[in-house]
Amino acid sequence: SSMEPEMEQKVKDQHMERCVNLLVDELGVYSTAQEAWERIYHVSALEALHIRNGHIKNPSAQTKERYQEFLRFENDFSNCLAVSALKTKFGPHLLSAQKILNQLKSTLISPFIEKVSRLIDENKERRANLNAEIEEWELEMQDEREDLQYCFEELTEMTQRLGRCVLNDQIKTLIPSAVLSFSHPFHPEFPAQIGQYQRSLCAHLDNLLEDRVLQCLSIPLQRKILDMEKELGLQITEKSCDWQLIYGLDCQSYMSDFQPDLRFRFSLGFTALWHRLEGNLPLHSSPFRTQKLRNGHKKCLPLPPLVHGNHWQMLESLVKSKGSLGTVLLGAMAIRSFNWPIVMILGGLVGSFYMYEYAAWTTAAQERSFKSQYSRLLQQRLRTDVQQTVSGFELQLRQHLAKVRNCWEAQSNETLNDLNVRTAELTKQIQSMEVLQLSLKKFRDKGQLLASRL
């Protein structure tokens, strides 16, 4: 009882002893009396309730002691409930969560981090290889661009050299033979028929010269260009295979003012002999002769004329006069210089030769004369346009080579752009993988922190 302190302490000791025996000896909850002593409480629940409700204004010392014991009981009881709950319910869940975290770390997060790291390294290596390939491709493009320029210059020089050679050769050899072998009805007595003959001859020469130039110049150039395109790796199209130089020859335009001279001319006539003599003998306007100086150069000195200029003018007027005065004077000089029989024999020979040439001056001979005059004039005029024609060939070649260059540049830039696109895609993949790797590492760190807290 609370009114008898001695009895209260005695009863308390008895209860303490009985409870210790119960907990240690009978129940075996604790192994020592000290542990059991700490779990024995002497409290009054009603008294503690009154104190908390404020019914006891001035509690005694024993009341305060019992209230403190009750507070210790509440604290130990709540801790016991918490420990019991952890052991019976929350403990297995915490262990299961910790096990799941460890499994996630070992089977998912760590391998995933390693996989992402390996992919990042592989993509970085691949990007480095692509960058090296881009640099190598740019250097290769520069080298190929220089080689292409050199090849273009070589083809241009070849076109100039071969074109000039082919044209001169065709003008020198093909035109005379082609004109001579041309066969078409020839009627010199009809001017309209001569014009038709000339137009047919021009068309024949146009086709023949164009075909020869195509075979000798265009086809070799086309083969070299195709070989160059194959070396550059360009796609050979039908347009590239069909390319050829355009050589539009129009002989009719060159010979539009051609007027053939089909009159009979005696080869031993005075005019013919005069032209031959005029071409062989140096006149007062003859070419200059050269004299070598001490310094190695040559000095031009005029050749002295065999006959004075005044004498040539007199002879020319006599020979070329339309009257018979020249013939009479020359005949008188011949009779005076030679005997009559010799003059008659020479006259007979000259007359016989004249009759032979006049009889041989047939339509075929006139056609040969026409072809000879036509061939000489056409050769002369074509030679003057050789350089202009070669320049036209060069311009066509440069235009085609410019198209080849543009095609090569487009293909090279397409390859370079493809490499740059692949590099950019790898860079994006690397960045996204790095972000993923960082997130995985954060999750791993949070999991480790949660596992340590559990």
From Swiss-Prot:
Q: Which residues lie on this side of the membrane: Cytoplasmic?
A: 1-322, 362-454
Cite the effect that the entry attributes to residue 150 to F: In strain: Isolate SIM3 and Isolate SIM6
- Region G5 motif, as annotated, extends over 30-33
Q: Which GO terms describe its molecular function?
A: GTP binding; GTPase activity
Main localization, broad class: mitochondrion
Q: What class of enzyme is it?
A: hydrolase
- Entry annotated with the keyword Amino-acid biosynthesis: no
Q: Outcome of residue 304 to L?
A: In strain: Isolate SIM7
Q: Topologically, how does it sit relative to the membrane?
A: Multi-pass membrane protein
* UniProt entry keywords in alphabetical sequence: Coiled coil, Developmental protein, Differentiation, GTP-binding, Hydrolase, Membrane, Mitochondrion, Mitochondrion outer membrane, Nucleotide-binding, Spermatogenesis, Transmembrane, Transmembrane helix
The protein's superkingdom reads: Eukaryota
Annotated PROSITE patterns: G_DYNAMIN_2 (PS51718)
Which family does the record claim for this protein? Belongs to the TRAFAC class dynamin-like GTPase superfamily. Dynamin/Fzo/YdjA family. Mitofusin subfamily.
Protein name as it appears in the record: Transmembrane GTPase fzo
Q: Which gene encodes it?
A: fzo
